[in-house]
Amino acid sequence: VTYTLTVKANVVPDGEIIRCWLPYPREDNRRQKNVALLAVSDSEYTIAPKNALHRTLYMEKKAVKDQQAVFSFSFRYTSAAEWFNLTDEMIQPYDTSSTLYKEFTAERSTHILFTPAIRELSRQVVGNEKRPLQMVRKIFTYINNNYSWASAREYSTVPNIPEYVIENKHGDCGMVSLLFITLCRLNGIPAKWQSGFMMHPGDVNLHDWAEIYFKGIGWVPVD
């Protein structure tokens, strides 16, 4: 994989420092391994720690009048799909006093909020179900069947993204993931946001998805 970022000539005044952060693979995820840096355009660079949430390779250089500034690096890694053949019997009761449980079942402004609209939708979709796996399946199936994909507005212009999805009957990957995360958290299932690049050969794109936590299993990706 090669990332290249080019700053056009004279966009930055001559002599000023241009700072560049390019995405670098995390190595604390079991779905990707064997990360190897192959080449870097600059001799001086910094790679963020392996567990950084937004891991990057950082470079900087002075702007030169009438010259482009090019930042580039290449790496390779091994990726794999991850699939869980889950059953209710595999999932242990949550430790509701744990730090993990409290953090990932809590509201988080401005989008993960247990509003009246979210609570009402939860009553309709989840009903009286108490088994974590079955609650997740109900939430996932409902969202998948009722909200079509649509290109998103700039997220910062939407006051509450899950409610936007409910009201407009559509959303992009991140929007429906936020609705899924919010409904899971409301029902006591730890859930969190994930984001990264889809590295399809010749068709790189950004993507968002969710992960949910089952006691005895760990974090499970949901897309």
Located regions from the model:
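Intrinsically disordered, low-complexity N-terminal segments that are enriched in acidic
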Residues: 1-83
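Short beta-turn/strand-loop junction motif enriched in small, turn-promoting residues
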Residues: 6-10, 127, 198
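Sterically constrained small-residue positions within well-ordered secondary structures
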Residues: 11, 50, 64, 164, ...
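Terminal peptide-recognition signature
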Residues: 20, 139, 210
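Acidic low-complexity segments
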Residues: 49-53, 65-167
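Active-site nucleophilic cysteine motif
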Residues: 132-139, 169-184
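Active-site rim elements
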Residues: 167-169, 197
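Hydrophobic/aromatic-rich core segments of domains that either
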Residues: 175-223
